[in-house]
Amino acid sequence: MVRARRGVLLKCDPSIKALIVQIDSERHDIILEELDETHLLVHPTKVEFIKMELNRLLSKNIYNPLDEEEEEH
């Protein structure tokens, strides 16, 4: 039987997909379907939340020398 679901198709590299899966593991309301290693079907109202969470996670992993200067002063 065929099911139709409204969603947004995301194409991303496997490392970003892993981060989105990690975000979804906490909430269980983001990913509708994992299609393959680079495609996800996600809930249409969660796209902005995914962007914000990815930016937050990725910014924690970026080295910024200016941060060290601020801590020294």
UniProtKB/Swiss-Prot annotation:
Q: Which domain of life is it from?
A: Eukaryota
Does the record bear Acyltransferase in its keywords? Answer: no
Q: Name one GO biological process term.
A: transcription initiation at RNA polymerase II promoter
**One cellular component (GO) term of this entry:** cytosol
Q: Read off the InterPro entries from this record.
A: TFB5-like_sf (IPR035935), TFIIH_TTDA/Tfb5 (IPR009400)
**Where does the record place it?**
Nucleus
Alphabetical UniProt keywords: DNA damage, DNA repair, Nucleus, Transcription, Transcription regulation
| Predominant localisation class | nucleus
Quaternary assembly: Component of the 7-subunit TFIIH core complex composed of XPB/SSL2, XPD/RAD3, SSL1, TFB1, TFB2, TFB4 and TFB5, which is active in NER. The core complex associates with the 3-subunit CTD-kinase module TFIIK composed of CCL1, KIN28 and TFB3 to form the 10-subunit holoenzyme (holo-TFIIH) active in transcription.
Function statement: Component of the general transcription and DNA repair factor IIH (TFIIH) core complex, which is involved in general and transcription-coupled nucleotide excision repair (NER) of damaged DNA and, when complexed to TFIIK, in RNA transcription by RNA polymerase II. In NER, TFIIH acts by opening DNA around the lesion to allow the excision of the damaged oligonucleotide and its replacement by a new DNA fragment. In transcription, TFIIH has an essential role in transcription initiation.
- The molecule here is called General transcription and DNA repair factor IIH subunit TFB5
The organism is: Candida glabrata (strain ATCC 2001 / BCRC 20586 / JCM 3761 / NBRC 0622 / NRRL Y-65 / CBS 138) (Yeast)
Gene giving rise to this polypeptide? TFB5
